[in-house]
Amino acid sequence: HGEAGNALLASSEMIVGKTPHTTAISLMPGMSPEALMQQVKTILNPDVETIIFTDIYGGTPSNIAYLLSREFPIRCISGVNLAMLIEANMLQDSDEEQSFDEYIQHIHDAGKEMIQT
């Protein structure tokens, strides 16, 4: 929602450097869900497993990701935080062999670890 994705991506790049395989897409006020879906579709590759990070589970971006998961090999992680994005970008450049499901779990766990009280 809004510029949250751009802000998270910029913050992540301050820490881990440029991330060529990461793109932020903004759902701006007045933008229709259909327009957002078309924008997301233009960057998805049906041959590449992709993670879509969204801010709120059940919000328009996560609902669109769910719909697109029927057509593309994508997984959606809702409730994104900076730690998750940093971990995802660091793992992209890693030589560590792991399945897509293991990659998703690793990112999820990294995000949870950074939530402390």
Regions found by a protein language model. Give the residues of each.
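N-terminal loops that bind phosphate or other acidic moieties
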Residues: H1-T117
